[in-house]
Amino acid sequence: MPRLAPSRAAGASSKSGKPHAIRIIGGDWKRTPLPVLDLDGLRPTPDRVRETLFNWLGQRLDGQHCLDLFAGSGALGFEAASRGAARVLMVERHARAAGQLRANQQRLDARMIEIAEADGLRLAASLAPGSFDVVFLDPPFDADLGKALAVAVPLVRADGYLYVEAGEALEPAAHEPLSGWELVRQGKAGAVHFHLLQRENKE
């Protein structure tokens, strides 16, 4: 995958359980609305953030393999599939949220998407290293980000990307798993800090 030059980018859910919708920003399913459950703690990645992220990634992900490790609404994974990803593995431990992901997958006839109802950390630890071109990491803000990074980082191919959403700005030097990684893009939208990382070029 191409390297990006380091740069600084500009840049409440209810307990009702009733459905609402996100929309796909670009690609084959552009402007398609997808129902998502309005569950406590479920934070779909905002349209503005997704648009910025996929601009960073070059709009299309043709032929690439992607992992959405804490899928939630599936906003990132469905967006990647819409933009040509050959395989998207979405992992979600919440049964109802995983059920909604499967319903949306069937609605789109998205055969490149695999839904795993499982604990993200445990499943990631069982996957082969270097399996993915892009790993999307958007854990709950109260989760241990260090543990998530420890299992996610080895899954990224040598020239791949790691995307991280968090409740505060990410400092790679503060996380041992990110040793040798470079923060190439970052931004903030509301309470969401978002970051794109790639391994440092040793050439």
Write out the residue ranges for each language-model feature.
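Class I S-adenosyl-L-methionine-dependent methyltransferase catalytic core
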Residues: M1-E203
